[in-house]
């Protein structure tokens, strides 16, 4: 959640001044999965409530994240940029990420979050009931 909020505060709200809505394309697994209460609670409290945004999250099912336009356009370029090079430190990884570009001029911006996150954070049923969540009618399989 820190990265989404940081992006909104440093880039998004300036680039999209009158935006009241944010769409996030997310992989279906990991910490931002569609079943993650921590992810949903964080989006509501840290992005929606704090910044007055409505957020739609489109989760890609397992094995389909390659259709995410960012992954589709950038990951192959990142892989080519750091191919056969030892990724032996965060600084090295960030260097290769930041120097990746596409032929159309798309660039990668990357920063390291050094925050130590707590493990086992639980969001209660009561906390979930407070959230303003709506599932889309069409949820393709």
Where are these regions (language model features)?
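Two-metal-ion acidic nuclease core segments, chiefly of the RNase H-like superfamily
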Residues: 39-57
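RNase H-like two-metal-ion nuclease catalytic core shared by retroviral integrases
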Residues: 57-79
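C-terminal accessory extensions appended to soluble enzyme cores
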Residues: 84-141
């Amino acid at each position: 959640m820190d990265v989404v909020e940081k992006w909104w505060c440093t880039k998004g709200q300036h680039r999209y001044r009158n935006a009241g809505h944010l769409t996030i394309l997310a992989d279906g697994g990991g910490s931002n999965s569609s079943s993650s209460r921590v992810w949903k609670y964080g989006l509501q409290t840290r992005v929606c409530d704090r910044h007055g945004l409505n957020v739609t999250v489109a989760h890609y099912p397992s094995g389909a994240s390659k259709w995410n336009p960012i992954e589709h356009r950038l990951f192959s370029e990142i892989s080519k940029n750091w191919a056969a090079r030892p990724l032996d430190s965060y600084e090295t990884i960030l260097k290769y990420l930041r120097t990746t570009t596409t032929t159309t001029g798309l660039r990668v911006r990357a920063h390291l979050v050094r925050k130590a996150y707590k493990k086992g954070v639980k969001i209660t049923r009561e906390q979930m009931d407070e959230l303003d969540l709506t599932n889309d009618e069409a949820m393709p399989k």
